[in-house]
Amino acid sequence: MSQEVAAFKLVLVGDGGTGKTTFVKRHETGEFVNRYNATLGVEVHPLNFATDCGNIRFDVWDTAGQEKFGGLRDGYYINGQCGIIMFDVTSRITYKNVPNWHRDLVRVCENIPIVLCGNKVDVKERKVKAKTITFHRKKNLQYYDISAKSNYNFEKPFLWLARKLAGNPSLEFVATPALRPAETAIDPEVMQAMQKDLEEANAMPLPDEDDADF
């Protein structure tokens, strides 16, 4: 008798070129099982994780480049149960556009757990520094530095979302997800420095910004 799997629609958004598809395809099941929804121009990647509370599957909706042609259709967001907003830490404009993606997502999905991810932290020319990443704190989202190419923090967004969706803050993954081999590596000292920067940034008071988008 096969074990029942809890499945959730995960909406993945962000500017084109931020590494969304690369990120999803790091997971082996996401690489070889994907369904293309031609109507919406969407690829759906089922990503499976084993937890100490049973198996969970995120059906990750990836835009397949549709965001380059303007906003996404509501059909992309409808019935979304959780979300990841991605930007590129080497491109300030992709972070500047995060509020737009967040607005569109919550307009349709309202109160769903959302993770903000700053991708490409393996690149030395980081433009969006930890201290300038404040949007998640204003909107009560979770934030992670990630690197799709090095697999750095790959499982963190999924673990946080799984805990929220299961209503169990102590839920753990019981097996490391099968990931494609890393294409690059991040020096452990650099990782520690990034983590320290994030912790210090999160401890700072939020700037007084009178900006409707934020």
Curated annotation (Swiss-Prot):
GO process terms (BP): protein import into nucleus; ribosomal subunit export from nucleus
Protein transport as UniProt keyword: yes
Annotated compartments: Nucleus
Region (Switch-II) location: 65-81
Binding site for GTP: 15-22, 65, 119-122, 147-149
NCBIfam families linked: small_GTP
UniProt similarity note: Belongs to the small GTPase superfamily. Ran family.
Record protein name field: GTP-binding nuclear protein GSP1/Ran
